[in-house]
Structure formats: structure tokens, C-alpha cells
Amino acid sequence: MTDGLGIAASSDLVYQENNIPDESLNNLMEQYYGIQTYHVIDDPNNTYIDHIDCWGKYLSHTKVLIREVPNTHPQYSQIEETAQYFASTLNKWGEPWEVYRIYTPNDEPYTNSLMVNDKVLVPLFGGSWDDDALQTYIEALPGYDVMGFSGSWQSTDALHCRIKGIPDTQMLQ
């Protein structure tokens, strides 16, 4: 994920899946994407997919959203460490990130949302935490139209994962 101003973050999967030295990959991120500050973080969910959008999202140039789980959850400590990490890092203006938390007690991927212009599309599950998830986005992003969408979402696969790369099957003929 990126803030659009030269700061990016990803899980350490980026290092695991690319057969080049970490420093070379960091240099490519700067050369091709203009990333001057690159946060590569151990995946706190510790699942098979290790995608950052399953637990975090930059909401703006100053705000980041990190999932929150009950203290009885198996990944509680790792997720809290990740939230603290972001709270201790600085945005482009040298200020600490404003960290918003979104409650996901049953691994709901509310962070796997999609932002398009002034709209935020949030995956919903028909559960008791859906309204709270929408409210978190409304509070974090005043002026945005926050909309919930039900679907066959999974904890590691929701709106952002599915929509960010919709192919045009007729494009290459």
C-alpha cells in the first residue's frame, strides 16, 4: 500500500517471493514507484496469503487503518505490535500516523475495502460488527461516501482483492 507521497508498506512476502536481495528490491521500489520510505512488515495475520490489505490500509496521507482483535485472538500480540509500529512511524510531514482501529473479532476483512474518488466500498458480512466497521470509516474519512457491500467474502479475500485488478478478457485478441 502507498500513501501516494513516497511512503509505502507491504508484508515481508515481497522479499520472500522475489529472488533478488532485499536492498535491490527496495531500490526498484524507489526507481519505479518513487518510494523513499518503504516499510516491510512481518504479516501479523500469519496466514497463507500474507497480503497487507487483509489487516491494514492507508486511508490518507496522514491516516492508517489497522485491524483490531480481542486479546484472546491467536494473532492479538502480532497485530498490536503492528499497530504500535505504525503509530511510531512518521508520515510525509514528519508527524506520527493517525492510527484508526477496526474491530475484526472473527477475522472480518473490513480493511480489504476499496477507495475510489470520494467513495469507500467496505465488505460486509451480515454480522454484528458491520455497523461499527462502517462507522469507523465514516469517522476516519469525513466527506467520503462510505458504502457497505455484502458478498461471498473471506478473511483473506474481499473487495480490494477482487476489484483492484478486474481483467478485460477481450483486450488482447
For each feature predicted by the language model, list its residue ranges.
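Histidine/cysteine-enriched polar flanking segments
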Residues: 1-173
